[in-house]
Amino acid sequence: MITYLAEKRDQVIAYYMALAADNTLSATQLDEKYKKQGYIQFKNAAYHNGELITIIWAQGHMLELKEPEDYKADWKEWRLDTLPIIPEKFEYKVMTQKEWQFKKVKDFFDKSRMIVWATDIDREGSHIAYSISLMTGILDQEGPKKMIKSLWVDELTPTKIQEGVKKLREIDYRVLQAIEAQTRAIADWLLGMNASRALSLLLEDKIGLKLDRSGKDGKIAVGRIKTVALFLIYLRELAIRDFVPTTYWELEATFEHPNGIYKGNYVPLDIPYSKGDKKGEPWEGDCPTREDWEKLIQNPKIIGDSNKGVIVEHEVELKEKRPPRLYCLDSIQEELGKLLGLTAKEVLEGPCQELYEVRKLITYPRSLSFYISRERYETLKQQAPALARLVGFSEEDLVFPERPDGFFVNDKKGANHSAVVPTTVIPTEEEVEALPDTLKIVYKAVIRRTLTMFFPKYQYEQTTIITQVGAGKFRTVGQVPKNPGWQVLFQDSASLLDGVIEESEARDLIKVQTNDTVTSHLVPAERHVKKPPRHTNSTWLRAMRTAGRDLDDEELIAIMKQIKGLGTAATRGAILDEIVVNKWVIVKQGKIYLSELGWLICETLKDERVLSQPETTAIWEQSLSKIAEGTNTQEKFLRNIYRYLGIENPHNNLIENLINAVDRTDYTPFQDFIEQAVAKADGKLGNCPLCGKAVKVLGKSKVAQCEDNILSKEEREAGATPVCSFNFWITVGFIKDKKKTLTKKQISDLLSDKGRTNLIKNIEGKYGPFDAYAYLSFNEEKGIYQVNLEVDKATSKK
């Protein structure tokens, strides 16, 4: 028997439909038939000599690294004296609710002659197959115990799957991919587990900050990527907070020529700034006041005689512009996310995954490559006329170069991972138009981007005029389109032009010649430094992708460019989601704001560069990538992590650095937040009016009580009397089974100086629903506190 391990059920169905000769069921019917069974079996003489084939899926990541308490019971409790937590050997465990499927996988692996890794072809897909193979015992550190091959396909079309099965690969490269991913996971576990515990414990010890461990009110956590990603938002918040409106002046000129009027911008002299923040830097032609420019105009070394000008240079060039690169996950998420109003995660897990897995219309969308192989280029070349018709063009519009352009085609860079392009499945125009709008927009965008390979380059005529006025020179640039080339593909999709066709500030110019004289009018133009805008989902993603480009170290800059920023295109959306769930940021109307908890974490960690700056990611990712290349090892990489955690390194390690960071941070601005957070974590809703202690609601109780009014079961059985008598029912209404339970906010309002709740709507009364305010009072006759209602006559129903 041959067992294929797929990553998801959709893959299993795609493989089965491509390989099973006698299948008559649709994908939906197959899904319904086999989803509970967990696998599909069949025979086909065309594959593996007719041997029984089992295709089973892993339900994504089926295994996870064990928790600290799985190694040692002492590690379950959060204590500083147990840090750093470093297991002798890292081990996996089966995720909850996936044990049943894992047992099936192991059973089929045990019975099979050969196993085929048929998961996604990225490092996480390889990690899934590798870790399951280790856990089931068919693979260990010395190598495979059975024959293991790899199915390497980047589109789920029958043709490509059939070709891939006939050309199964060795697993050597995928093992290196998997070890890289495994090493990253272990390193992130070590850093996150130790730093999160240390920071939480230190903040609780020094300032009393305590958050509910459920995370519902926020979470104190540290991660190699997510903390640095948070700092991108923190730095933008600082820039907004510290922004000082600034006005400056630049020099413009209007020139009168016999053939008309044109404008020019002053070309700054090669001199440095003499004062201010830019002192010593090359002058950019700006002045802090209009008066400064008025004086400079009179200076014969700058301008001098400013009434007349002479055209000293006039150049006309025919220029070409390449189209954008083919789509990779980064670019498709940014451009189409902005167009469709979706987050990066939604673009990937929505239209992209459906077009790939279900519709089979685009290649693997998680690819980070924007190259294709020569073989795929030739296939797309044959498909180009049919693809062109789907977006309103014909074969006559296409141009097929004699040889592929290396800008798109690279066998070395496009062989394993292809750019996102259409597959060999070409739907009819009617089928495309029948697609849901989101899928149609994404699919047509991929077609257009791909067809740019078979359209001429955009050509334009650029005219540059240099006009001499006294000692000064002014530059004027104009552009005239000559051949729209590939840009015609986007003329009917204006919303896609942003980021594809750059808007030029140049313009068509009047006809002039060198040595023509002109009349000049010089005008200092007022400019304003703009306040930095708040990050949105798309600008934050771009900041993640370009993080580290402003580092001082040229080598680190090169590394950050190579690794394409923080995280991966597939994980960045999830990182933002996690930051929101952790209550570090608040998203309002698409804009990202730093929360008080986010501010507190950033203020604490701002000087700990490993946790706040992109250099760490650059160095880590460079070292990790060498594992996949075979030039580095997991052992060597983790040795450095252990040193940072304090092994054989008593100073300048993680724990010591965090202790110092908490000690030197001023938490005075966060006192109100800290008090509120502690109250929530302790379940405190307010202060007892009798003794001043905390009032709480236990579990699903309908009674709010002073903490000194609460007795344990043992105390009640022993006949103990509460120290404080304060408690009250927290339900309102007059119909027994329809009473409203007050929210925590409403209970807090009752116990605050405010003394009553906001308006509570639709309270059930004997004569129908009504609206009322609730307030707390003492019933002297009964000797108890109770909630009373003040009916709102203006809004209550009659």
What are these regions (language model features)?
Residues 359-360, 583:
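Glycine-centered, phosphate/nucleic-acid-interacting loop/turn motifs that mediate DNA/RNA or nucleotide
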Residues 275-327:
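Metal- or metallocofactor-binding catalytic centers and their adjacent structured scaffolds
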Residues 1, 85-91, 200-220, 313-321, ...:
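Short hinge/gating elements
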Residues 103, 110, 158-255, 317:
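C-terminal or mid-to-C-terminal helical accessory/interaction module adjacent to the motor/catalytic core
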Residues 2-3, 98, 145-146, 242, ...:
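Basic, low-complexity terminal or inter-domain segments flanking catalytic cores
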Residues 31-71, 227-274, 393, 453-502, ...:
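Structured, non-catalytic alpha/beta "coupling" segments that mediate domain-domain communication
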Residues 1-193, 197, 287-290, 499-500, ...:
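Intrinsically disordered, low-complexity regulatory segments
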